[in-house]
């Protein structure tokens, strides 16, 4: 019967996916069996009530918590520290709001895209201008004119060229060490 078909349709639905499933449950619970053929219009109305309740269901919203956390992480970064921040910006800009729970995998993919873009970021190199200027001063000196030039040479040899922008203070300290060794 139409009522049984409507009940079967309601039973296959996952009520956890909907904002309010009570209308469907109420319609199913309101079924009165043992009607005779003269009461067919009432039976048809029961089936229609269930169908209408199913059609009125609204999916719950997708959970954007991971997306929001990834966006917050991206926003906390100083984009000027990275060689190319555009992939992160593109992933954040690609977020589409308003998805429902049946589209959760798409929402999760948006969060993953942002996280992956953040993971792929590469820091800019540190600025070695001051170090290079200090070394140029050293190269202009005649080391034979000094009693002990080893401190200057040690300071120059201590320079490491693999620092990134977050380690700028270490690079600046290398330049200062060379300058201090020259004045000593």
Q: What are the roles of these predicted feature ranges?
A:
Residues 1-184:
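Beta-rich interaction/scaffold domains
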